């Protein structure tokens, strides 16, 4: 499949002048493999800095996770900062912590600078299902404040019921610097911004080989790019044919999303009066928000190994109705799946495949914001300052136990254990 999946996002995407397919031999400073957020953010930062940039996308801009996700701007990393402190030491934690709110700031700056129409709304809620989770949110607030986020507000059970019309929650952490967007329209807007800055973007141009030479040569079925530098940014949709070493360090995982029919203004505002996005604190979490046209977009669950379930509605609708029983009987207009890339450490993987070939992948569910940080860091590196990129590149990249064969059942067993703990509140 090369066209966008039949999602709400594809149905409501902004129109854009299509990008050509590469059918010739060209040269550039930097060739970026992948037209999702990692590739787009990298290319835009570099184009703004004066680099001659080429982006090669196998399908359409935002085809993968960047055009299918929940659209939530979630700060920080998938691994909490206190765990980072214990795992990697305070010096590394201070460096990583100093960057963990930059991704959202970059997105907001991009939206403003390029007038990207992507339905941005501020504010994100992390909701607690029990007292243990609420205590963890209190700790998270303290930890984030130590690293500079002063836009946090802890809500008790009464306060969260004023923000979300559900009786499931014992409290919440409101991050005023969070928010939500139409993710595919953000990707389209960023691709147009690359073009505006002189970059070249190609769709339907799947990379078949990266030749590790100086300069590097990136080949597609109908053309090739000779580049001083290459950035591999395919993430969960890269596959294992191009740079197979990357596939050994990560695992694609699927998540499922549905979108309701349009709700009345009164009903929509009764559910989430201030139009925040919401995610719970379970290991296998639910996440949801309202769209610009008053639909409820609801996602949840993980399929390890990225197998598409037979019936997305059967999996997700019960979750939606458990949260909002008042929506019983609501029609579901869209349902889809999408893959994200999981790492064993839950930290992003940055690094070098050769002296002039770089990669960034594995945001483990925090890709919307973290990809935009990644683009800034690779641009810094290619401009001569590798310090912040190397703060990530120096982290260990562990393979999943069991290798390619057993990593799925082993990880699923671990997830089942933590999900049971969530249900028991321990």
Swiss-Prot record:
InterPro entries: FAD-dep_OxRdtase (IPR006076), FAD/NAD-bd_sf (IPR036188). Keywords: NAD, Oxidoreductase. The keyword NAD applies. Pathway: Amine and polyamine degradation; putrescine degradation; 4-aminobutanoate from putrescine: step 2/4. It catalyses: gamma-L-glutamylputrescine + O2 + H2O = 4-(gamma-L-glutamylamino)butanal + H2O2 + NH4(+). Its EC number is 1.4.3.-. GO terms for cellular component: cytoplasm. Signal peptide: none annotated. GO terms for molecular function: oxidoreductase activity. Coiled coil: none annotated. Gene3D superfamilies: D-Amino Acid Oxidase, subunit A, domain 2 (3.30.9.10), FAD/NAD(P)-binding domain (3.50.50.60). One of its GO terms (biological process) is putrescine catabolic process. Belongs to the gamma-glutamylputrescine oxidoreductase family. Involved in the breakdown of putrescine via the oxidation of L-glutamylputrescine. This is Gamma-glutamylputrescine oxidoreductase.
